[in-house]
Amino acid sequence: MFTKQYYETLERSQKFQQQSVNWAGYGSYQYVDQLRSIVKEHCCQNMLDYGCGKGLQYTDKNNFADLIGIEQYALHDPAYDQHASMPKGTWDLVICLDVLPFVPESDIDAVVDLMLSRCNKICVIVLQEITHVKTKKPLVCVKDHAWWQQKLSHEKVQLIWRQSTVPFDYSKFL
């Protein structure tokens, strides 16, 4: 299903995940308002978080799913052992927040197809405006808006763009 490059990138991502406090999942909180609106608009009751990181946003006292109005959720992140297995079933909402630039270009279609195969209503994909690639994170697919818009053009996909220069204050949720 995936290319050799995907598995090589996944191995780098797994090492990064093990050695870093990043990818804990707390970045999800910055999308609470947008996702809450989407959940209401599409009457979503359950959700798959594809690329959830360590998933700490779901163990926090301010549970991310509760904040956006989701009753049931499942977690998947191939780079983190505890969430590496893909949950069975389909979900009203599939979210993929700041994940796709870590997937090789040759595997984007396969990953998106996998997410859409688990999606009943809406798949929300968040992409960050990346202006430079000086990072320890294993970015492999840095593309412009037009490329992503064309690549992710599907009736179930809703794109959210975020600017990398906007600071985010987690404290209002913790």
Residue ranges and their predicted role:
Residues 82-84, 91, 95-96, 103-174:
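S-adenosyl-L-methionine-dependent methyltransferase catalytic module, highlighting the catalytic core
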Residues 1-90, 109, 141-147, 163-173:
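Conserved N-terminal segment of class I S-adenosyl-L-methionine
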Residues 46, 95-98:
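Hydrophobic transmembrane-helix microenvironments that flank and shape a buried ionizable site
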Residues 51-54, 98, 103-104:
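Generic secondary-structure microfeatures
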